[in-house]
Each structure stands twice: as structure tokens, then as C-alpha cells.
Amino acid sequence: MKVSDRRKFEKANFDEFESALNNKNDLVHCPSITLFESIPTEVRSFYEDEKSGLIKVVKFRTGAMDRKRSFEKVVISVMVGKNVKKFLTFVEDEPDFQGGPIPSKYLIPKKINLMVYTLFQVHTLKFNRKDYDTLSLFYLNRGYYNELSFRVLERCHEIASARPNDSSTMRTFTDFVSGAPIVRSLQKSTIRKYGYNLAPYMFLLLHVDELSIFSAYQASLPGEKKVDTERLKRDLCPRKPIEIKYFSQICNDMMNKKDRLGDILHIILRACALNFGAGPRGGAGDEEDRSITNEEPIIPSVDEHGLKVCKLRSPNTPRRLRKTLDAVKALLVSSCACTARDLDIFDDNNGVAMWKWIKILYHEVAQETTLKDSYRITLVPSSDGISLLAFAGPQRNVYVDDTTRRIQLYTDYNKNGSSEPRLKTLDGLTSDYVFYFVTVLRQMQICALGNSYDAFNHDPWMDVVGFEDPNQVTNRDISRIVLYSYMFLNTAKGCLVEYATFRQYMRELPKNAPQKLNFREMRQGLIALGRHCVGSRFETDLYESATSELMANHSVQTGRNIYGVDSFSLTSVSGTTATLLQERASERWIQWLGLESDYHCSFSSTRNAEDVVAGEAASSNHHQKISRVTRKRPREPKSTNDILVAGQKLFGSSFEFRDLHQLRLCYEIYMADTPSVAVQAPPGYGKTELFHLPLIALASKGDVEYVSFLFVPYTVLLANCMIRLGRRGCLNVAPVRNFIEEGYDGVTDLYVGIYDDLASTNFTDRIAAWENIVECTFRTNNVKLGYLIVDEFHNFETEVYRQSQFGGITNLDFDAFEKAIFLSGTAPEAVADAALQRIGLTGLAKKSMDINELKRSEDLSRGLSSYPTRMFNLIKEKSEVPLGHVHKIRKKVESQPEEALKLLLALFESEPESKAIVVASTTNEVEELACSWRKYFRVVWIHGKLGAAEKVSRTKEFVTDGSMQVLIGTKLVTEGIDIKQLMMVIMLDNRLNIIELIQGVGRLRDGGLCYLLSRKNSWAARNRKGELPPIKEGCITEQVREFYGLESKKGKKGQHVGCCGSRTDLSADTVELIERMDRLAEKQATASMSIVALPSSFQESNSSDRYRKYCSSDEDSNTCIHGSANASTNASTNAITTASTNVRTNATTNASTNATTNASTNASTNATTNASTNATTNSSTNATTTASTNVRTSATTTASINVRTSATTTESTNSSTNATTTESTNSSTNATTTESTNSNTSATTTASINVRTSATTTESTNSSTSATTTASINVRTSATTTKSINSSTNATTTESTNSNTNATTTESTNSSTNATTTESTNSSTNATTTESTNSNTSAATTESTNSNTSATTTESTNASAKEDANKDGNAEDNRFHPVTDINKESYKRKGSQMVLLERKKLKAQFPNTSENMNVLQFLGFRSDEIKHLFLYGIDIYFCPEGVFTQYGLCKGCQKMFELCVCWAGQKVSYRRIAWEALAVERMLRNDEEYKEYLEDIEPYHGDPVGYLKYFSVKRREIYSQIQRNYAWYLAITRRRETISVLDSTRGKQGSQVFRMSGRQIKELYFKVWSNLRESKTEVLQYFLNWDEKKCQEEWEAKDDTVVVEALEKGGVFQRLRSMTSAGLQGPQYVKLQFSRHHRQLRSRYELSLGMHLRDQIALGVTPSKVPHWTAFLSMLIGLFYNKTFRQKLEYLLEQISEVWLLPHWLDLANVEVLAADDTRVPLYMLMVAVHKELDSDDVPDGRFDILLCRDSSREVGE
């Protein structure tokens, strides 16, 4: 900067220059206009860094993408350091929420249009140039608005999280499935990300009044920038005036900027008005009022598209408007942060999701204002219910208690919007007044008014009964009903006493009070008195406090979280119990007020005298602190002998404790008064017996019944725990879910559940109400809560990702239990203390306390939760490092799965009856290993994505089924499972921490092997916040000592215990198992030596890939084996025969060829090879191929080669030749082991080995072995394996071959060998025999050797080739040499061999040869049967929610795309077939059975392919059931049988319709439709339940879509699903029946309409108007779901039975039946006649009696 510029800069008085330059952005905002007018400026480009969010200047090295996103600014450059430059840009004073930044003349617009479209996503709106200038402010100040949006969103989230159960919050975002709030706990970084995404839309909301599209609502006064609130007010609520102060000032503190949300909400409301407006109309001064008739364009119809928005209170009063605005505040949080299940908060297609929410929300609000008579759950009842008190009639809520003779009121008003009734008992004086008013004063009032009184009209709130036609009821009738029903009437106006009248009395009375209270303040004051004065006097009376909260119209959550009242719910107890609770609460209140000192409700007689005395003593001193006194119960004495007897019951008469520590702990738990105990013992120590024996001892007590609870961390442990704890019948064990759903059953001693059950609200409520429930249900107080046992409680602290799920445990009343026991094998003091505090307990005791001192301690009186937990650390007491009995090996391998498979194969070869556990790191790896290893073992796999029932079932199967060998799972299988046969644990996880290691190794109770396998060149991933770090390199035992706080022995004697090769502490069985495994490993290493020499191309190309897939079929495995044999064997032969032939040929015949041949060939080839090269051959060959062999061989192959080869061929060749030659040949060959015999024999060996080796590689070995070998072997073997090996071998036994062989073996053995192996190995070898040998050996060559070679080529090679090429393979063959198979297994990243095989199997099972593939074809039905049973309209909407409807997966099979089993060209997906299979199951089940079936197949809800396999197992059974159940249906629909009404005896006796003629039935049918047409009645609703509601759009529409929209608008489909079994299908299934599903029926029906019209005209009568297709379809759908009608029709018409699918019902309805006069009418006409008969008396000859005579086998419907 120049000196002159610096002076000008100083004059600018830029005080904040230093702080501004410290900003990390290259672009710094400067508000000084003087600076920019004084100092020269320049234009530079800037961009926003995506990672840091900072504004950076574009430089030479800036990337292309950043340059593309850059923008230009007018700036002043300032050097702030060495080579550090900042740029100042002009921006006026920092914008606030009201105004925002102001554009300056230094702004250079660039790509503003593109910016608006891409950034704001409001391309559907039109902007002018001024709007673009306004919108560009955000681009210039994006960082500011990002931070602004983040602060607002953070504030919203804090409010919603602090008050998740507030009424406004609950209404706006609530999980509509579970009813619980779904405000999620978000990290600050997540909220910041959401805030940045929300920033553009926050900017729009703040500046929406500055845009041209908002000009319609600008104020008319000059200079006024605010909104015309009066006009906006009228647009929002055109019928009800509201006070403007509540509109503009939501809360005073908000508008005073104490809470800036007020400004945001104000703008949101303006945006809502903008959305509903019809556009700019007449400029800013247009004051035209909108009438009621013009409301449709103001509030357009909104299609929710699946968005669930709870209806709000109508904002027609200031208070309700404020509530509505509070809901909008919650809506802002809901739409922007809390309900954002995915990262995509905004909808790219339809703009901002928040705008849609607001639009739908205010549409509901405005619609409620217009239609105030419509039923709204949030508005019923709208007052405290005092106006609607009735002493008679259907709405009666005033009763008299039989015992106390007191008036009781059942009111259903509740603040949280529910209609659950509340029982309130009045005192005696008030009851007398009410009784006198009803019995005396009301009768006098009726007499005074007289019989002509008719002031009351029929209002919707009245439930008029006793009249056949409610529309014909007169006002006199209504008035008489009201006088004899309701208490508070305004007879002058003809209405109930308004709520305002009662409120007015509250303002006037009591007259002597200086300050009056309204109803709300009175109610709050009463409940405050109830909390602080009418307090609980007993420990067991805490539920009464909760009952008082409920009776005061507070939710349970409000009472617990805000007022500190215990959790409770009246819905968790029976109806009688709820009544007694509320009676007792009223009694306590009346007694405290002194209204009746001697009043006792009927329940109080069950109290004990001791309780009354204690209560009187407590009530005498209200001002003192109320201490909790434990109610006395019978208690039997305990002794140490109880534990011994329990042990003998469980383990037999020879029972003994493991050690004194176990004995002492059992006595401590059973005998001591310590309320809370924590135990840390090593895995496998027997922690279960520490509480199992005391539980058995408690169960043996006769007078007192103890009910205890055990909780484990994972579902997979439930089955194992229930089996162990329920053995020998010592305890009655049941799941906790039974207790939560049904309560205590009276027989269970121990309930077992998981942590989620412990944290559930229902369990907390059950425990809180335990005392009262037991006393009310069993009429005794001798049932007591025993032990609360939590196993592996360290998970409360270490399971970081589950800690949010444990929050509900803090609400549990621990004091209700006699003792709490916490067990773990990996919970040192620090972990245990933190885990206990996390669930609401005090933590561990800091120092030991004597039991006598404990009894005197004041803490004991406060209960278990306030007393510290005593810790028993058996690991420190014994000073022994755990898990020393297990041999722990840590290995780094290339492939973890392959190494694990080797270990498992070796284990089961050594110990066939053993079991093993494999712990994988991911769920995908679990499934892949299970699929890959199924051909080797009986596998069970488990991971967290399975359902709870499936986890329990699989765990139980592995524990109980001895044939199951391997359990594969994630780390959830490492805790708590006890399996005696377990001998090996393998962990495949690079992120294994010390706790997971100890828990996994601890599964080996009696010793065994534990392998920790990790990949080479791998690194451990960074652990998440709060998680334990992974285990380190080095000694495992030392890390275990460090974790438990034991003394380190690093570098000392005894450091290694069961690790690092130490075996001193292992059992003899474990050592023996290790030795056997080592021997097997040596054999495998010897057999796999040739694999080391494999080219790198045949090794795994990418061993560091995280996800691997393995071959799972014999076909794929054989392919890999054969390919490896081709490549590796031939390559090894080439390598063997190039460098040093003699040594390598013999050595390879011994070590390489034999081993390779043995390893790579199957049984038949091995047999051939073994026949030719015995074990002695190898030894003899090895003996002869010493170090001097090379010298010998390189020199010449005359004497030494002969000797060496003779040694090789005396056993090998003779054995191989002996297999095919005679005795003379053997003797001659043995005798002729001279210079030439050996070469001959070695050549024979070479030829035969080549033939054998090549013959065992492929299928076409016989004809041409060279075709299957590699290049080098093809060259040398092709000469000997042409058309006839015999001829080539005979042809090569000439004299010239000897010289050739001698020539090739003199100069260079290597070249000679290469020459002999390329041109004529067999010929040169066979020709090397001498004259005498030739005569003998050539004969042997022609007769025996040829036959040997031929036999090997034809028989043995064929057999081996056939066996090897067999696709199915042989399990024993494959497992004969498993090591080589594993090492040669191919690997593919996508489309693994397992997937390919699975795809092939499914394709064969479901060929899908045509587009009309149907599951009925799969079941075996014929085409004519399928025609009538065809499943029309079965698609995704038929399935219930969550069944085969997962997103983000393959649409055809619902699997991950890497595991997709769909095949190219597939016309019908597996998911489609699964839908139809589900429909077939629906055909065979009624509503209840089908509902149970859906629950049974819950594990398959996300796996249609697995469901098809499950379905195909029952294929024949299902086919038989359909044939049996639908035989009548096929006979009728195929016109083989005709229905005649006269054949139905019950129909003729019980219905007039069955005695009508066909003409009468048709006339009745047309009359019904004529009445429906005239009244414009909803057809579907009428035939569903005879409800005559009007729907004019349905009759005027000619399009199916319009009809569906009309029915949907009226809520018909919603009522249909809630009232009938339609809810068992998808929510859109019934709606889609109006589409093209039934086009064949539609064409048939429309054809019948034409024929009907033609017949009517031909007869000369006026044609009757018949319904069009849509109305006709609505009729049949309504009849199908009308349960009463269906039962009635099936009872009367004996020829038909039940059908459960709508298409079958439609097809059945169109068959013709014979009426009483033998004329044919469609069955649907008969249906309509029966339907009409059930509802009216328009049937000829009068109305029939519905209560017909009942058949013994079938009952009439209700």
C-alpha cells in the first residue's frame, strides 16, 4: 500500500481493521464507504472452499471446478504479512434479522440467474431485476447467513429437545407408529450442516416481503414497508376476527429479540399467506374482501404425498392462534432437523420440503376453520367436559358408586388430546347436591316446561337413539331427550350451558376472595396442592401420585420430566385397577381438604392396619419431610444351607463350589443386606451360578413368591440364557416381553430380556405399579420383586452407539427390587463406575463399609438408587491373569477367510465333534463367509440386521443341535454364550479392542484355540469418540494385565500365559490339540510347496480389498481347481524341465510332479499316480537325487543318469508298468536297468506322467492331451499324445533314437532335456533302450507300456477327467486335499461365484419364460384353472407396509446390488413373484390367521428371495389346500355347476330374497341404485356399513381418477382400512382397484350394459339406469369388506364359501344364479338384495328377522 493510500486509509477511521484482517477468509468485509472512495480498487475473483467454507481468492493453482464456481468482487488489496494478502470488499453495517445486507454499487452481477436456480431451487417462481439484486445479497454474505441459520436451528433444536413432550411439539412431529416423539439427538456438527443447507431458504423467509411476488400484501400507506396485516389476517381466517397483537407478537420476549425465533416465525406466516394467495390482485391498495363463496382459490386442495401432518387447533381465538404459532415453531425444527431421516432435506423437484409442510399445515388449519363441525381428534372435547355432563343416555358420564354412595364423574377431557376417561369421585356433600338436582329439581323443571317444549334442535354432538329415522326426529323429541339426559341446560336459548358461563362464575366467586382464579389456574393450583400437601405416605403409594397427575389432565411424561413424578400409565393396568387407583386418589384428596374425615373408598378395605397407622403418623406432621417407609411383608429366614440345597438340585448330589471366592459371593448375594452388588470375574468363571443358585433358593420359599429379572445385552443370548436357567425345572423362566405385554402371570420366577426391554417405558410403568397390580390381581402382598440382574453391564459405557437407547433406564424405580446385581467379565472399576452412573445409580462405593454401619446409614433409607454399589473384583483378588487356559495366536495373513478355512478344516479333521465361532467385522462379511463355507461345514450365521425372533432361533439351534459346527457372526456372538463343545474361536477384525478380545476368548470355557487373524499391510481404523482403542502389537497377556490393573511381568518369568508360543499353563487336551493341528499344518505345507512357485498372475491380485466373495458351489470350485491344474502343473513341468532336467525331473517326479499331480488331480488320477509312484518311489528318488546329481547329470546321462533313473524307475516305472505289463516285462525291465533302460523307463515315466497329468486336467484328455496343456507342454507332449500314444511310443523305439538320446544328453543336460521334452520325449526315451532291452522293453512298450499308456489315457484318465469335470463333484474328492483347493480359489469383486450359482438355481426354479409368469404356474395349476384363480392387481401395494418394500436395494430381489441374483432379460422379478406368493397365502387364511402369518414371516419382510425359498418348501401342501378349498369356486366360475337359491335350505327359511323371482330381484336392484343416484350417496361407504353420506363428485365424474380423489377426500379409504381387514394389505391396494387391474371384468360388464339396454328397448319399456363401471366396482368392494353382510350371505347361500382376495370376489359376483322361478340373474344382484334386506323393510312381504335359526356348524354374522 502506498504512503498516500495509507494516509487516506487512516483518515477513513477504520477502527476494526486489525480484527478484520485476522479473519481467515481472503475476502474481508469493510463497511467504510470513505475507504473505497479514496483508495483505488480492483476486480478479483473469489470462490468458496467446500471443505472449510472460507472465501478464497482465485490463484494460478486454483482448480477448474473452483474457477467455475468463482464470483467477482470490487476489492482493495492489503498486504498483512510476508506474501500474505487480504482483500477488502464494501459491505454496509452488519445486517440484522429484519433488514439484512444492502446491495452496493461495487457489486458486479455475474450469473445471478444461474445462482438463483441452483442455490435457492425456486425456479418455479418469477423474479425481476430488483429481485435478483435482493437475492444476490445472500451470495455476497453467505457466510453470515450460514451462521445465522445455524444459530436459529440450534436454538430450535434446544427448545424441542428440552420440551419433547410439549403439546405443540407433540402435535407437529410425532412418530405415528409408536406415538413417541422423534426429536433426535443431533451433534453440533450435524446441526451446522443442516443449518447451512437451510440458509438460502432462511434468507428467502427473511426477505420475502422485499420481492415483487409479495407486493400484493404490502401496506398501502406511503413509506410503510411492513405487511398489510389486516388484509393478511382476513386471508388467513376469513370467518373469525382475531386480535392483531397476537398475530404480530407471538411472545413479548420474542419480539424484543430475547428469542429471535419470533422474527423468523413472523416471516414464515407471511410466506404462508403468499403461498395461499391467488397472486397479485389490483396492486397494493386493493382492499377487496373475499366472501365465503370465494374461498376455494384461496385454500387449494393439497395432495399430501404421504406426508403425515397432525391437525391443529383452529386459530379463531388469540389463545389458539398462539398455540398454532407454537406448532409452527416446532414445525421449523421438525422439517429442517429432527425428522430429516436422510441427508436430503430439500426436495429438488418440488422446492423446499419445509414449504410443503407449511402449506399442508395451514391448509389443515384453514380447513378446520371452514368446516368446524368436522370431527377433529385434537378438538374433541374442546372444554373440560363440564358442559357435557349427562346422567342418562348414550353419552352418560355421571354415575353412583354402589359402595360409598358417592357421585362419580367419567370425564374424557385431556390436555394431550387423548379421549381416555378419567374417574373423579365427589365428596358426600357435593354428591348430595347433585343427586338432589337430578332427582328433584330436574323433574320440577320438566313439569314446568311441559310436553310442548321444543327449544332444542338436533346438533351433531347429540347421539340420538331409539328412532328408526333420525332425520324425522322433531325438536320436541330432541328437547325431551336432552331434559332427561344432560345436567346443565339453558332452557331459554335451547342449548347447553356454555363454557363461558361457568368461566364467568369463576370470575365472580368466591366473592370474599381478593383474587379470582380461572379454570386453568384453579386446576394448576389443585394439582400443586396435591403434589406438595397430599403427598405419598408410603413407598407403595407412588403410583397414586402418578394417578393424580393423570386425573389433573397432565400426561405421564409431563408429570415425570417437569414435576418429578414417577412414571406411570393407566393403560398399563386393567380396567378395575385403574378405577381403584383413581378412587384412592380422590379419597386422599377429600380427606386432606377435610370434606369427609371418615370417607373411605371401596378399595381402602383391603389395606392393612399397619398401613393405616403409618399413614396417620405421617399425616400428623405435614410440614416435615416425608420419609419413605417400606411396607412390611412376610419374610422367611435364610440360611447357608439354602444355597447348598439349590446347588444339589441343579448339579446333583456331588455339587461343590469352584473355590472359596464363588462360595463367598453366593452367600453375599443371598444373605447380605447390600442393596446393590457389582461383580467382575473372568469369563468362564461361573458368574451365572452366582445368581442362579440364590434364585433357586428364593424360589423354594413357600410363603413369599419372588419375581426376578435378568437382562442381557443382545438378543442372541436370550435362548442360551433361558436354556441354562431353566434346566432341571428348578426355575420357571419366561421372556420379559410376556411381562410387558400381559403382566405377571403368577407362576414365573425369572423373566429374561435384553437391554432394550429394560429401557422401555412399558417396563418402567409395570414396575412402578407392581404393588398395586399384585394386590388387585392376586389379593395378596406376598409376591415380591426379587433380584434385578444385569449381565455384561460394561456395555452401558462401552457401547457408544447404543447409549441413546439406554436413556430410559434412568426412569426405572430400582428401589422396588430387593437387590440389584451387575455382572461382567470386563468391567474394571473405572468402567463399572461410569456404567452405573450412566443408568442413574450413584456408582461404586469409594470405600468399604461395615454392614452394621450400613444399616445405620441414612443412605439406606433412601433406597437402592441412592446407595453406592459394592464392587467384588475377583480378578484382582486372585491376582491371576484371565484366559491363561486358552492358546492365543495372533497371525498376519494374506487372506483372513482362507486362513480361517484352513484352521477350521484342520480342527474338524482332528476333532469332528467340536464347534467353532468365527467373529467377522461386518454383516456383509458374515453372509459371504456363510455362503462360501456351507459346502464344508454345517454353518449358522447371525448379525444385527436379523429380527429378534430369528436371532433367538438360530442361537438356540447352534447351542442345542450337535450337528452344527460353525457359528459366524459379528461381535454380538462373543458375549455370554456358553457352549461345551466349543474348541476354537477365530476373530477376523482389525479394530478389535481389548474387551471384545477378552469376551471372545472367554467363550472357550475348558480350553481351546483362539486365532486373531489380520491382513498383512493393513492398518487399524481410527476409533470413534468414546470407543476403546484397538489392541496393540505385542504380547496379548500384557495388554490383558494392563486392562485389569494387574502387575506387569514384562521381561520377567511368567510373562506369557497361553500366548507367544507358551504352553505351560495349557491343559493336556489343549496341548494335544495344538500338536495335531501343527502336524496337519506341516502336511498342508508340504502338499502346497508347488504353489509357492506359481506365477504371480495366479495369486490374488488384490489382497487388501475389504470385501471378498468366495466360490460357493462345487462347479465353481472345480473350475478354479482345473484352471489351476492346467496353469500350475504345466508351468511347473516347464520350470522343472528347463534348468536341470535330471535333478528336476526326478525331484519333480518326487516332490513336485507327484505332489502337484496328487494335489491338483482328483481321486482317479491320484490312484493312477499313486499306482505308478509309490511312497517308496519318492524316497528312492530323493535318495538318488543328491547334491552330486547335478554334476552327474550335467556331465552326461550315460551311467549316472541310468543309475539315478533306474533308482527312480525300479519302483515307479515298474509299479506303473507293472500295472499294465506282465511278469516277464517287469523282470526284463528290472534286469535291463542299464544305460538305456533307465532312459526308456524315465521316458515312460515322463510320457505317462505327462499323459496322466494332462489327462487329469480337462475333459478331452483322451483324444488330445496336448489340447489341455500349456504352450511348452503342448510342444513336447503333442508328439507323444497324438491320435495314438501307443503308435508314437512304438514308433520311437528305433536304433537311431539311441544316438539321438546320447547326443542330446552329452553336451548339455538342460538343453538335452529341453530338446527331449519338446520334440520327442517319448520317442527319445523309448528309443534309448538297448537292443536286448528293446526286444524286451519294446515288447513291453508295444504290449505292456502301450497298454499301460492307453489304459491310463483311456480308462484311468477318462475316469479322472470325468470325475474332475463333473459339475456336481464329489464332496469327499473335494475335501481330499483341501489346501490346494483353497489357495487356488478364484476371487471376483462383483458377481461372485456364489451369486452366479444362486442366480442359476433361482433361474432354473423360476424360469419366467413369459411376461405372464404367475406363481400359480409354479405351484402346478393348469391354464384353465389359472384363468379363474389369476391374481389380478397384485403388486407392491398389496403388501403391508415394510414387507418387500425396502428402498436403496435392487428392485427385483431386494438385495444389495453386489449380491443381486436377478438375471439379464428377466421379465418378472422375484419380488413380483413373492407378492403373488403372499397373495396365495392370503387365499387360504382368514383375517386373524393371515395377521399371524405376517408376524411369522417377519424375518423375510426384507428378503423376497428367501421368502420364495420358504414358500417353495410348502409347494405341494399349498397346491393341495387350494385345490381343496377352492374346488367349489372353480366349479362355479368355470360354469360346471350352477347356483340355485332353492338348493339353499337356510336361505329359503331365513330370507325373503331367496323366495323372490328373478324379475323382483332385478327391480329391487334397480330401485337401490335409483335411490343412491337421487341422493348422491357414496356407493362404497353405503355398501360397506349402510352409511348414507353424500358425495356428488363420485356421480358426476366419468374418470376413475376423479372418483378416487373424491373418495380419498372424504376419507373413505382411510375408514375402510381402519374398520376392516383391508388394513392387512397395503394402504393403496384398495384405491388402485379402480385402475386397469380388472379391465377384463370391466369390458364384460360394459358389454352386459349394452345388452341390457338393447333388451329393454326391445321389450318396449323404459330402460332402467344401471350404474357405470366405477360405481359398480365401488359396490362390489364395499360388499367384500362388509363383514356382517359376508357372514350373512355365506350362511344363506350354501353353495359358496369364503374367498379372501378381492379379484376372486369380483369374478364370483358376475356368475349367474337361478332365482326361485328358475330365471337367471347375476349373483351381484342377489347380493344387493340381501344387503338391502339387512338394512330396510323394502322387501316384498315385509321385513324378515335377522336372528335366524343357527346351524350347528356355522353361525350367523353379527
UniProtKB/Swiss-Prot annotation:
It comes from the Eukaryota. Residues 1142-1384 are annotated as: Disordered. Keywords: ATP-binding, Helicase, Hydrolase, Isomerase, Nucleotide-binding, Repeat. GO terms for molecular function: ATP binding; ATP hydrolysis activity; helicase activity; nucleic acid binding. The keyword Isomerase applies. Residues 900-1051 form the Helicase C-terminal domain. Belongs to the helicase family. Yeast subtelomeric Y' repeat subfamily. This is Y' element ATP-dependent helicase YJL225C. It comes from Saccharomyces cerevisiae (strain ATCC 204508 / S288c) (Baker's yeast). The lineage of its organism: Eukaryota, Fungi, Dikarya, Ascomycota, Saccharomycotina.
